[in-house]
């Protein structure tokens, strides 16, 4: 287990992922490698007018031994922390503490996995996917991503390209409020989990793929109960990360 430690983080790049989500790329200001496991998170210490606050963000990038790491931040109206981060420009520095978290996956594991996410819950799963590809693992990794509107989909082009480039990666999107032009899946993620889980078991030849679930608490609870109940997924094969 990598020990969490405090360090100064410098913002080096910003890019929009959706109308409300920005990717913030940081690096350790001391130039040391930022060591973490795919799926972990980091605390940022924000100097707000009312006093310092800590905000936790999952790491979207895969470990590569460099000082750099990426975070995806949703701007919440009236949310002082997210609005502060959305105003930051490259060159700004913040105190950070990390890495933290047990929501991890061995990048070299051949075990098939269904990744289920909504919103920025896809970020630690993106990290796991990229870490597995870097390790050359032969795992079937399927992603089910849920959003309200098409404009809310983040990392879409990247994940679609990865899926096109490998017969072991599948990327599915479902929209709860998709417009008339949307031709993909509709509804909430839990409506599609049973079908995809059973298909993954058949495609991989493994009767009990792992399930990694990340997003808001209610979705995580519903999918976890579905996996453990209707689908009979072994307890040790169900992994969750809940966002407030």
From Swiss-Prot:
Q: Where does FAD bind?
A: 55-58, 120
Which Gene3D superfamilies has this protein been placed in? Nucleotide-binding domain of ferredoxin-NADP reductase (FNR) module (3.40.50.80), Translation factors (2.40.30.10)
Please state what class of enzyme this protein is: oxidoreductase
Role description? Transports electrons between NADPH and ferredoxin. Can transfer electrons to ferredoxins Fdx2 and Fdx8. Prefers NADPH to NADH.
The EC number of this protein is 1.18.1.2
Q: Which PROSITE patterns match?
A: FAD_FR
Q: What is this protein called?
A: Ferredoxin--NADP reductase B
Task: Quote the Pfam families the UniProt record gives.
Answer: FAD_binding_6, NAD_binding_1
Q: What are the alphabetically sorted keywords of the record?
A: FAD, Flavoprotein, NADP, Nucleotide-binding, Oxidoreductase
GO terms for molecular function, please?
nucleotide binding; oxidoreductase activity
Its family? Belongs to the ferredoxin--NADP reductase type 1 family.
Instruction: State the reactions this protein catalyses.
Output: 2 reduced [4Fe-4S]-[ferredoxin] + NADP(+) + H(+) = 2 oxidized [4Fe-4S]-[ferredoxin] + NADPH
As cofactor, the record names:
FAD
Q: Which residues form the FAD-binding FR-type domain?
A: 4-106
Q: Which organism is it from?
A: Sorangium cellulosum (strain So ce56) (Polyangium cellulosum (strain So ce56))
